[in-house]
Amino acid sequence: MDRVEADNQSRRGDADPGHRLSGKRAFVTGAGTAPGGGLLGIGEAIAVLFASQGAGVAVADVSAERAAATVSLINDAGGEGVAVAGDLSSEADNARCVEEAVRALGGLDTVVNNVALSGGGGSPTTVDLDVWERVMAVNVRAAMLTARHAIPHLRHSGGGSIINISSIAATRALGAGAYAASKAAIQALTRDWALIHGQDRIRANCIVVGHAYTPMGVTDEAGRERRRLASLLGTEGVAWDIAWPAVFLASDESRWISGADLPVDAGATATTALGIHTLNRSGRTDGELGPSIPPSTSSTSPVT
């Protein structure tokens, strides 16, 4: 084995290439199955995919029933999952959920702050303050509390990965109000945590999600077509498209990446409204935009 291959081998460790997260233990928030099943949420997809890649996964959700539904999917596929339920914006609930996860999994290596609410948009003169405050509590306070209670366990594990889920609404004006402000805050916190806890070998990174077809997004066909036209690829993503980059950021493959914002948006933020307008007037036809997302991609099986 030459020097380069030996170095690469030391970086890869003993991980099975088909199980990139073997031995990892992850706490994923907002990972319950959406009411009624069907369209897959981002947290659910991340939890299921992490487990399929060899991680033990704690599925955290405000609903015990929804968390248990995701764990059933994980366990039925031969993975290791445990459900924890509570309001993660409550310090007491958050601390309890993290401790339950640690007891069940034997520790933590990875945290995914995904739980979020939309709402609180519009003019400051008319916005519902109760909605605004609830969005900020769930989207920002819950992430901070999860990090607060999980970081000591990541330290105990010798380091780990914090993956925060943000949105292009953080940097593009979409009229999203509190949601946009909360996601901008998440990106700022990501950089701070990367700075403060790098000495603990804890990495913090952010996935910045574009126009994905999820329960939280636009689901009517006209809206979906507008969103496809708003990307450079002429397509919309699904939850798996966010879950795969999360696997990378949780794995040792990303061991030298911290403090980064990773856009997963089909190029939506790589250009301007004028660039998109020019692209769509250049002869790109509906047939070149890619097919509508078939029902099979909202199933519970990771796409490859």
Walk through the language-model features, giving the residues of each.
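C-terminal helical subdomain
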Residues: 5-12, 17, 206, 225-257, ...
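Canonical Rossmann dinucleotide-binding motif of NAD(H)/NADP(H)-dependent dehydrogenases/reductases
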Residues: 18-58
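Alpha-helical segment proximal to the catalytic Tyr-Lys
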Residues: 152, 195-199, 255
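Catalytic loop of short-chain dehydrogenase/reductase
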Residues: 163-185, 190-199
